[in-house]
Amino acid sequence: MKTFVLAAATFTLLALSAAAQTAPEVRTVASFHAIEVSNGIELRLASGTAQRVEATADDAEQLARLKTEVRDGVLKITFDRKLNETWTMSKTRHLRVSVTATALTALHASSGSTVEVPGAFTTDKLDVSVSSGATLKAKFTSTDLRAQVSSGGVATVAGNAQRLDVGASSGGVFKGGELLARACDANASSGGTVDVAVQETLTAKASSGGDVRYSGSPKDVTRHTSSGGSVKGR
């Protein structure tokens, strides 16, 4: 009986120790207006009246290597890889950072990172890029929204924009069927795909197998296609 109690107590202590190691860690960082995330890290972004950065990982060692640093107003979220370290996506799938931002002018996701913006984020001007297998799912309300998706990146964006400037290349995909833009410039090249909803004015360029699809019955549509590119309404 004593052996059983001792074993149970030991197990409880180990469990508590593990829980303590993986508890979310609130980071104190300088003020920022832009975010860059990479290395397969999961980012959950929200709008709020006070900025907040919270990091979680599977263990204390990974948490210490999960970096959240502000440089020139940009919050850089990265993982500190060791020299000659063999790297696979499985090693980053449990690296998560939750960010509350008071303002946002740019959001860049790369290298297999995942960005989710579950609530509407309102901003005047926003520059978004998604590349190298990264994914973005967001809802934005913006006066001027610029988005570039490349190298297998996928961006799924809803909301509203007075003006949308979007480009997709090298297999990048921009899914903006639920993002209503008053005016839009869309450019798809090298197998990139752009899907947009436009109210008034659309200028669409497609080349080298790029594909632009649009809805919303825009009043004025200008098309430029070459080298197997396609621009079509749906």
Located regions from the model:
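Acidic (Asp/Glu) and glycine-rich low-complexity loops/linkers
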Residues: 19-110, 114-129, 139-146, 158-165, ...
